Amino acid sequence: MTPNVTSVRQTILDAILTKFRAMEADQPVSDPYGITWSTVALGPLAGFDQRKRYSLGLVPVPEKETFQMPYVMCFLTVNVEFRVTRNQDDVSPGHLAEQALCVIKRALTEDRTWGQRAIDTKIAGSEVDLVTYADRSVEGVCMATIQYRYNYEDPRNPTPDLG
């Protein structure tokens, strides 16, 4: 038998990764995103991501838990790091950063429960790292807090034990 080592937390992170990986610049047709992410990974951006047009890294940071029988209530902060490499005819790096932040915030709030896996998702803030207007690439981060819960006895189980 294959062991089940997938926590509720991991299913939420996987849902977020799936959302960003599925993004296409021209989709949905009625209201396109305008961005297709070249690389999306769990973890911080790496040096090789500088060669990509749009890079995204999902970085979970310290999580707070409170015990509320029969649940453990969790508040997970996730940093969504991004890097955009500027092409010759693009708008300014500052505008590219704002566009990327808009797309990230839109994705994080379209389904705040991540398919009923979480209770809520809230944007906690954002930051852009721009040195000069002539920068070839721009980086930034959008912080989100995801509230979810799991069974008091099992982090894989989102259902309370009422027995």
Kindly give the residue locations of the regions a language model identified:
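Generic structural signal for alpha-helix termini and adjacent loop/cap motifs
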Residues: E110-W114
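Glycine-rich, aromatic-bearing surface loops/beta-hairpins
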Residues: Q116-E153
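Small/polar-rich, solvent-exposed N-terminal microdomains that initiate assembly or binding
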Residues: M1-P70, G115-I119, P158-G163
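Oligomerization/assembly interface segments of phage tail-like spikes and tubes
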Residues: Y71-Q88, V138-D154
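Short, charged, solvent-exposed linker or helix-capping segments at domain edges/interfaces
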Residues: V91-G94, P155-G163
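Short helix-to-loop capping/linker segments positioned immediately adjacent to catalytic or ligand/cofactor-binding
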Residues: F67-Q68, D89, V131-D135
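Extracellular/virion structural assembly segments
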Residues: T11, Y71-F75, R83-T109
